[in-house]
C-alpha cells in the first residue's frame, strides 16, 4: 500500500470513486482500494508515484476546486510494518538518509485502534536524528501512521501530503 486516504465517516464509497477517477486520469485503471475496517480510512495501492498524485490533486484544487470533495487527506506511505516500536524504528532507519545533516524535522504520530505509546515511539525515533527539530516549519515530516496492527511510515517534505482543508484555506 502506498497511500492512505481519509474521508468523512460513511462516505467511503464516494471517496473510493473519487480517488479511482483521479488515479484513472493519471494512468492507473486498476488500483487496489481497500477499506481497512476503520470508518473514514481507505488504503490504496497504485502504480502511480504518490508525489505525482499529490501534485495533480493540488493543481486540480486550483483549476477546479469543486472536483475534490471526499478525499480529505491523501497521505503517501513509503513503508509498512507491524505496529511494534522496534520494527517501526528499523524501518525509519531505512529511510533516514532522506534527511540531510542541516535539515530540520518533526515527528508526527497518528494512531488509530492501538494503545502503543506515542511518546515511546517519538523518543526512539528522535534518537536516530541529531537534526534540529522544528514543529511549525520543518523541512521534513517523519510520519508514523498507525492503523491497528499495521503502521505506515514516510519521510515527507512539509508539503508532501494533500489536505482538503488546507487547500481550501490557501485558495481563499
Task: Give the residues covered by each predicted segment.
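SAM-dependent transferase fold signal centered on methyltransferase-like domains
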Residues: 1-172
Amino acid at each position: 500500500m502506498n497511500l492512505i486516504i481519509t474521508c468523512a465517516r460513511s462516505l467511503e464509497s464516494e471517496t473510493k470513486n473519487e480517488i479511482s477517477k483521479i488515479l484513472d486520469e493519471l494512468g492507473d485503471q486498476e488500483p487496489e482500494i481497500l477499506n481497512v475496517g476503520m470508518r473514514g480510512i481507505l488504503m490504496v495501492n497504485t502504480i502511480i508515484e504518490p508525489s505525482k498524485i499529490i501534485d495533480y490533486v493540488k493543481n486540480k484544487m486550483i483549476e477546479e476546486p469543486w472536483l475534490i470533495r471526499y478525499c480529505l487527506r491523501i497521505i503517501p506511505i513509503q513503508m509498512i510494518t507491524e505496529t511494534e516500536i522496534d520494527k517501526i524504528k528499523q524501518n525509519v532507519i531505512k529511510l533516514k538518509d532522506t534527511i540531510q545533516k542541516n535539515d530540520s524535522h518533526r515527528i508526527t504520530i497518528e494512531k488509530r485502534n492501538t494503545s502503543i505509546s506515542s511518546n515511546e515511539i517519538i523518543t526512539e525515533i528522535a534518537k536516530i536524528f541529531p537534526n534540529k527539530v522544528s514543529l511549525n516549519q520543518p523541512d521534513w515530516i517523519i510520519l508514523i501512521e498507525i492503523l491497528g496492527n499495521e503502521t505506515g511510515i514516510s519521510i515527507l517534505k512539509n508539503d508532501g501530503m494533500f489536505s482538503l482543508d488546507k487547500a481550501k484555506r490557501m485558495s481563499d
